[in-house]
From Swiss-Prot:
Pathway: Cell wall biogenesis; peptidoglycan biosynthesis. This is UDP-N-acetylmuramoylalanine--D-glutamate ligase. The gene is murD. Gene3D superfamilies: Mur ligase, C-terminal domain, Mur-like, catalytic domain, NAD(P)-binding Rossmann-like Domain. It holds the Pfam family Mur_ligase_M. It comes from Yersinia pseudotuberculosis serotype I (strain IP32953). It comes from the Bacteria.
């Protein structure tokens, strides 16, 4: 534990995480200053009167006067104001680093381009099924510092690459990178390897590394084979096995669960289940409890979520697919009796969409593209694509042609902020329109 008494602390970024940082320092007798580049950030009205605040931009004088800056994951470390502070010797960390310095419970740490929230929640459910007290948070739901107030046997953290950049003291009992696909190109101008390097920090000082046998980018750079356990579709310590039309989860050759017993569907979710099972095994959660959780967990909203089944048509909300890799995962191995009606579009974040082309083949797919980068997506296969301005217009086109046996899938491969408040807002609108049009 670190003594912060007498330290001049600046917190950048409010919201739930920023407020948890304020509470953390006040509880330790330190009154921080707070700044946010937004004029009216969430949580501003909840700050104690003793806390000085600066909104609308960054206060460089405060930053250079600080001993410690706790920065929101949403603020790039490459920002000139932060670069100047770092060069002046000011320590810059994030809330996860604060958590790691204080935490006493074993930690399961989960990162990756796609599937993080599902696997994080699933490991938490496995621990609960075993009767363990468990805290689940980080980049999902509850801020990590809030979990410090709980007396948990296990902490399960979802960690983004941005959070890992400012974390130095993580010592996970088990850590995984689920996958690495192009994302956040605006924050990683040097490309995929720069993004991967941030993800790889999750393995530092980890007792066990859980790696994806199908994705070499998830492997530790330095030799850590003795600490590595793998999962994958066909290969890996934890893998899938198809027999007589049924798919089983297998661990080192032993069949442990028929996927028919799971509420989750889709090959990407089966590999998520394998990763969660490997993590749970690594920290000693009884296998029977983990398998029980796999049969009851129905998934998270906006993640390949069935929102309507009517007249033989299934409408699936995968709005959380905010990058190409996530949409590829949704489409990989997807089987549809009739025609797949795929909705793509939004803000592509300068991504390369060409990887989607192989999933858009055949005559049983129709593509509906919308939003800022809809034109680029429609160009992948113009003969089966229609371009509209909005998702609502695209869904109106879908509703005119769907037939029993068809599937309508919103898996946009793009961020939502060009037309929606969040991916949740986009997903809720999809569900509302499906109910209206289906």
């Amino acid at each position: 534990m670190v003594d912060y008494q007498g330290k001049k602390v600046v917190i950048i970024g409010l919201g739930l995480t920023g407020l948890s940082c304020v509470d953390f320092f006040i509880a330790r007798g330190v009154t921080p200053r707070v700044m946010d580049t937004r004029i009216n950030p969430p949580g501003l009205d909840q700050l104690p009167e003793s806390v000085e605040q600066h909104v609308g931009d960054l206060n460089q004088e405060w930053l250079l006067d600080a001993d410690l800056i706790v920065v929101s994951p949403g603020m790039a470390l490459a920002h000139p104001a932060l670069s100047e502070a770092a060069e002046a010797g000011v320590e810059i960390i994030g809330d996860i680093e604060l958590f790691c310095r204080e935490n006493q419970a074993p930690v399961v740490a989960i990162t990756g381009s796609n599937g993080k929230s599902t696997v994080t929640t699933l490991v938490g459910e496995m621990a609960k099924a075993a009767g363990w007290s468990v805290g689940v948070g980080g980049n999902i739901g509850v801020p990590a510092l809030t979990l410090l107030k709980q007396d948990n046997q296990l902490t399960v953290l979802e960690l983004s690459s941005f959070q890992l950049e400012t974390t130095h003291s993580l010592r996970a009992s088990a850590a995984t990178i689920l996958n690495v696909t192009e994302d956040h190109t605006d924050r990683y101008p040097l490309g995929l390897q720069q993004y991967r390097a941030a993800k790889l920090r999750v393995y530092e000082n980890a007792k066990v590394c859980i790696v994806n046998a199908d994705d070499a980018l998830t492997m530790p750079v330095r030799g850590a084979d003795s600490r590595c356990i793998s999962f994958g579709v066909d290969v890996g310590d934890y893998h899938l096995n198809k027999q007589q039309g049924e798919i089983w989860l297998r661990v080192r050759g032993e069949k442990v669960l028929n996927t028919r017993e799971m509420k989750l569907s889709g090959r990407h979710n089966y590999t998520n289940a394998l990763a969660a099972l490997a993590l749970a095994d690594a920290v000693g959660i009884p296998r029977a409890s983990s398998l029980k959780a796999l049969t009851t967990f129905s998934g998270l909203p906006h993640r390949f979520q069935l929102v309507l089944e009517r007249h033989g048509v299934r409408w699936i909300n995968d709005s959380k697919a905010t990058n190409v890799g996530s949409t590829e995962a949704a489409l990989d191995g997807l089987q549809v009796d009739g025609t797949l009606h795929l909705l793509l579009g939004g803000d592509g974040k300068s991504a390369d969409f060409s990887g989607l082309t192989r999933f858009l083949q055949g005559d049983r797919i129709k593509v509906y593209c919308f939003g800022r980068d809809g034109g680029q997506l429609a160009a992948l296969r113009p003969d089966v694509s229609q371009l509209t301005e909005t998702m609502a217009q695209a869904m109106a086109l879908v509703a005119k042609v769907v037939l029993p046996g068809d599937r309508v899938l919103l898996s946009p491969a793009c961020a939502s902020l060009d037309q929606f408040r969040s991916f949740e807002h986009r997903g809720n609108e999809f569900a509302r329109l499906a109910e209206e049009l289906g």
